[in-house]
Amino acid sequence: GPSAEEVMEGKEAPQDQGFLEEWLARCQEIIDKYQPDILWFDNGINSRSLDPLKLRLAAYYYNRAAQWDKPVSLSTKHDAYLYGTITDYERQGRAPKDITSHYWQVDEPIGNKFGYIEGLQIQSSSQIISKLVENISRNGNLCLNISPKADGTIPENQQEVLRQIGHWMKINGEAVYGTHAWMVYGEGPT
């Protein structure tokens, strides 16, 4: 079978029909049980050979959303889904450098790792807010990953950064929610 690296990079994926049907059934169960606003797949479904299965999932999800009268989105790494979904870039450095015609997002950890480790170095609220604003100005978004401890608690230093971001959003939310990219990135009044 394929190596883990091949699966993660989308070069190959498990082709066992039983596995694929179970994956689809589990996704459908999550959709029905929780009515998520967004389905986000980190990796593992990038292979073009899985397109028929991914189309079945997308149809199921979007049809359910129509029944709920609710807008929803699909997001995946790379180009696992076709145009119309939200492309996800891991970490800010991989984000588009110019305005795009499609929506996208960056999944960015609050610290230097996605998971919790003792002594985790975290970003300041200013650094995170700058990334958020930068992404919005190019038609993107920021999916901020927090790093809770094994017992589920969020360390105080991360909580403080989240509170600071929340305070900034309370004051400046109008400049974030419902906005869109300008015609030329970096152009316009400051």
Could you say what each language-model-derived stretch is?
Residues G1-T190:
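Mature catalytic domains of secreted/periplasmic carbohydrate-active enzymes
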